């Protein structure tokens, strides 16, 4: 092999090796790019998942807060409505005095437990009615009593309040839910 041929052979080997190195470098560069792209995609997917999870958590927190505020507003509104309804019902008690009140008063007297009732407190309009049912008692008028009566034994050791106001007050926890149901049904 001559000098020229040796140089040509070395050049060919060098070019082949250079081509192989270049080819290997390009393959390695493509592999690195592919790995980097895959990692970037995984990071994007992971980030999107975390973001979606964070958004869902924030949405749940916002919704829970809104539900809590709505519940508080609803409770405050229902409480205010309950007070207004109670006052309205109380102010309407005088209608029970219209027709048949004398019988209602007698029924309230019959509900009293046996006792020596010495003091009877009634609405001023019921003084004569109370005197008929309790001839031996002190009859006292009190304008705050719409109807019914308060009785007590001598010395006040035992007393019974059987006024329309007190009866409504005792029945109110049972009446209110039914009234509210009727109101909501009409809405």
Swiss-Prot record:
UniProtKB keywords: ATP synthesis, Hydrogen ion transport, Ion transport, Transport
Transmembrane segments: none
InterPro entries membership: ATPase_E_C, ATPase_V1_Esu
Signal sequence extent: none
UniProt KW Ligase keyword: no
GO annotation (BP), single: proton motive force-driven plasma membrane ATP synthesis
GO CC, alphabetical: proton-transporting two-sector ATPase complex, catalytic domain
SUPFAM superfamilies xrefs: V-type ATPase subunit E-like
Pfam short name (any one): vATP-synt_E
GO molecular function, one term: proton-transporting ATPase activity, rotational mechanism
Superkingdom assignment: Bacteria
Gene3D superfamilies: ATP synthase, E subunit, C-terminal
Family the UniProt entry places it in: Belongs to the V-ATPase E subunit family.
Functional note: Produces ATP from ADP in the presence of a proton gradient across the membrane.
Protein name in the entry: V-type ATP synthase subunit E
Species of the source: Geotalea uraniireducens (strain Rf4)
